[in-house]
A protein has these predicted regions:
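C-terminal motif of bacterial Sec signal peptides marking the signal peptidase cleavage site
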Residues: 17-20
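A sequence/structural signal for flexible, mid-protein segments enriched
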Residues: 22-277
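Bacterial N-terminal signal peptides that target proteins for export
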Residues: 1-9
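Hydrophobic alpha-helical context, especially transmembrane and signal-peptide helices
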Residues: 8-11, 32-33
């Protein structure tokens, strides 16, 4: 009996060894070589000059250093008549941690319904176009907070924001909240994309978890977005969450421009400052 047991054990060890040989296998995936595309990022804001970042795309495993495009012809046209040329100029925005390389001193002054059109042509003939319509600002009604029932020294508050949705149109929103830190910097506390698909024409109330302390200073911005920009930022967030996850589906960034990648939009928002006391 002992003899058969030893033979069986030896057989099982041999099978395990053979199976282990097949568990590791190098697979070489040949990625397609895609042509580079122009990449643009431009946000128009009321009362501010125009700044635009123009670079080109790169492969996933290539260096992250962007290729800055020189000598491109960049124009923004307002309502089909007023042409605003942008010139090459590298500017560093330390507050928002952005670098732009085309700009104009023209200050954005617009009304809801105004249309801005972007046209870019680089020296090799690549062309990018985009268009954005100015929306009315989101009517931010009220912001407030409420503490939990813990002892005062350990209490935390949740934040609530209220606004009225316009029933006459499809609406998309982005809600940002930043907190001033002790070093004079700013920490992001909330970034939410919201639509009115289930709340058309209703009072929208958005709340956070209990996360804020007494003495916190919060800066709240409610953006009114068009559908292309809403889909752009939603796809960017989906791509960020799936990056590095072997079980996640690949995500395609939904650009707001044609002929390349990126975003061109007008930002219209209301802002409030709230101190937790």
């Amino acid at each position: 009996m002992k003899f058969y047991t030893l033979r069986l054990l030896g057989f099982l060890l041999m099978v395990a060894g053979l199976a282990a040989c097949d568990m590791e296998q190098e697979i070489e995936v040949k990625l397609p070589v895609l042509p580079t595309q122009l990449v643009v990022e431009c946000y128009l804001e009321e009362g501010k000059p125009i700044r635009l970042a123009l670079s080109e795309s790169a492969g996933y495993f290539e260096g992250a250093q962007p290729v800055i495009i020189h000598n491109a012809t960049v124009t923004i046209t307002k309502n089909g008549s007023q042409v605003i040329p942008l010139r090459f100029s590298v500017d560093v925005d330390n507050e928002n941690e952005k670098i732009t390389n085309y700009s104009s001193r023209h200050v954005i002054q617009s009304q809801p319904g105004d249309v801005y059109t972007l046209t870019i042509t680089d020296p090799t003939g690549r062309r990018v176009t985009g268009s954005t319509t100015v929306l009315p600002p989101a009517p931010l009604d009220s912001v407030g907070y409420k503490f939990n029932d813990k002892p005062k020294e350990s209490q935390e508050a949740y934040l609530y924001i209220r606004w009225q949705d316009d029933p006459s149109r499809e609406n998309f929103y982005r809600l940002l909240t930043h907190k001033n830190d002790s070093t004079g910097g700013v920490d992001s506390e909330m970034d939410a994309e919201i639509n009115d698909r289930l709340r058309n024409g209703q009072k929208i109330i958005y709340t956070t978890t209990y996360r804020f302390d007494r003495g916190d200073t919060l800066n709240i911005k409610l953006f009114h977005l068009d559908r292309p920009y809403y889909e752009f930022i939603s796809s960017v967030e989906d791509a960020r969450r799936s990056n590095g996850n072997p079980f996640a589906q690949p995500v395609t960034i939904k650009s707001t421009v044609a002929g390349g990648y990126g975003v061109f939009t007008h930002l219209n928002y209301n802002t409030r400052e709230l101190i937790i006391k």
